[in-house]
Amino acid sequence: MPNYSYNPTIGRTYVYDNKYYKNLGGLIKNAKRKKHLIEHEKEEKQWDLLDNYMVAEDPFLGPGKNQKLTLFKEVRNVKPDTMKLIVNWSGKEFLRETWTRFVEDSFPIVNDQEVMDVYLVANLKPTRPNRCYKFLAQHALRWDEDYVPHEVIRIMEPSYVGMNNEYRISLAKKGGGCPIMNIHSEYTNSFESFVNRVIWENFYKPIVYIGTDSAEEEEILIEVSLVFKIKEFAPDAPLFTGPAY
């Protein structure tokens, strides 16, 4: 019904209420959209059985080359209902000989290589045979430089270590990546400044605790390593000239 109103300045006007009018194009589009959704739901029902399976999107397996640096291997005893600190970034994790050998092998001078990510990997193995228990792990990425972590803590909301008893943590900060392109030259300038300026400026320094769900004290072989995810670039020009090159 039209809505009549009187305006003395312009005379009688007619105002129509558009509440009951629909755009014809909109009606057709909505009908096609509903039809498409119904067909899409029928198609999706064919894949309902696959909902019982899990597929992990693991950046560790993505593009790039993985270069592993083993920091140390050692045996630790872990008491029940407790977790032991295994990574505290003391001097033994950064032995100059270990790092020099790693950089020489993994970052040759002839390539420009960018560090896309760094993973801390802890591989855990029971030293005694016929033991039936699962490994537990807990970590923190950010902590104050003055904070001194406890060597042993009680088990509080840990996560179970997954496949192959390997616990892996991405250390990349928000945004990811490392701006240094020529790792070899940066390392050879100064070992100490390389670790502090290149590694810890761009990646987190985590603390990691390991435990078990066993009711007895267990002896664990722990291997801790850093895995560098590397993107390689071809050099702009050869570094050597002559018939041998």
Curated annotation (Swiss-Prot):
<dbReference type="InterPro" id="IPR001746">
    <property type="entry name" value="Polyhedrin"/>
</dbReference>
<dbReference type="GO" id="GO:0039679">
    <property type="term" value="C:viral occlusion body"/>
</dbReference>
<dbReference type="GO" id="GO:0005198">
    <property type="term" value="F:structural molecule activity"/>
</dbReference>
<dbReference type="Pfam" id="PF00738">
    <property type="entry name" value="Polyhedrin"/>
</dbReference>
<comment type="function">
    <text>Major component of the virus occlusion bodies, which are large proteinaceous structures (polyhedra), that protect the virus from the outside environment for extended periods until they are ingested by insect larvae.</text>
</comment>
<comment type="similarity">
    <text>Belongs to the polyhedrin family.</text>
</comment>
<protein>
    <recommendedName>
        <fullName>Polyhedrin</fullName>
    </recommendedName>
</protein>
<keyword id="KW-0842">Viral occlusion body</keyword>
